[in-house]
């Protein structure tokens, strides 16, 4: 629309606007579509989802497609990079997510304590499931959690800290770690 506006020298009337609006270009990167389809298939095989958000901009780092895909599973939000965010504001965000009946914890993925806090929060969120497994004699069954989030929220760093070794390559730019990984 802006290009058409510039083309006509900044003079667009109502008819021009209607014409421009009927030719909206819908564009979504193919690799993102592929990943979302894979997530839709894999969500059936996990017990819960862990959505990693940037503590400095939680709503901006929340992808609505991830929300849609993970809607039917127990969910835990981890506000990563909490050491870089204002603690008072981070606490308000935690209250916000908990008010929506979702678990939420503030962490710094670079510190081992963050991974331990997430593990404890996941166990709390899945207490009912773990108890049912115990009653059925499946107490030793592994809990599978899907870690998801937009690029550069710290997923690879979290995986490496949680696993205790460099399982995922991490860098300060998006697209370094691609594909599905079981840790």
Model-assigned labels for residue ranges:
Residues 56-58, 82-85, 110-113, 176-177:
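Conserved nucleotide-binding/hydrolysis micro-motifs of P-loop NTPases
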Residues 85-146:
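Canonical P-loop GTPase G-domain recognition
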Residues 29, 36, 57-60, 128-135, ...:
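Active-site phosphate-binding and catalytic loops of NTP-dependent enzymes
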Residues 145-164:
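Glycine-rich phosphate-binding P-loop
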Residues 47-53, 72-81, 102-106:
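Conserved beta-strand/loop subsegment of P-loop NTPase cores
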Residues 31-34, 163-183:
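Switch I (effector-binding) loop of TRAFAC-class P-loop GTPase G-domains
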Residues 8-71:
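N-terminal accessory targeting/assembly segments
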């Amino acid at each position: 629309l802006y290009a058409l506006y510039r083309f006509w020298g900044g003079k667009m009337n109502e008819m021009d606007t209607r014409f421009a609006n009927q030719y909206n270009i819908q564009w979504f990167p193919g690799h993102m579509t592929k990943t979302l389809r894979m997530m839709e298939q894999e969500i059936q095989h996990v017990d819960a989802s862990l959505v990693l958000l940037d503590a400095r901009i939680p709503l901006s780092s929340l992808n609505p497609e991830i929300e849609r895909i993970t809607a039917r599973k127990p969910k835990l939000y981890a506000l990563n990079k909490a050491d870089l965010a204002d603690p008072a504001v981070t606490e308000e965000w935690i209250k916000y997510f908990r008010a929506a009946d979702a678990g939420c914890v503030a962490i710094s993925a670079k510190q081992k304590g963050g991974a331990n806090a997430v593990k404890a929060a996941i166990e709390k969120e899945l207490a009912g499931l773990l108890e049912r497994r115990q009653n059925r004699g499946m107490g030793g069954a592994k809990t599978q959690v899907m870690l998801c989030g937009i690029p550069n929220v710290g997923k690879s760093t979290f995986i490496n800290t949680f696993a205790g070794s460099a399982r995922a390559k991490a860098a300060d730019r998006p697209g370094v770690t691609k594909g599905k990984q079981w840790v």
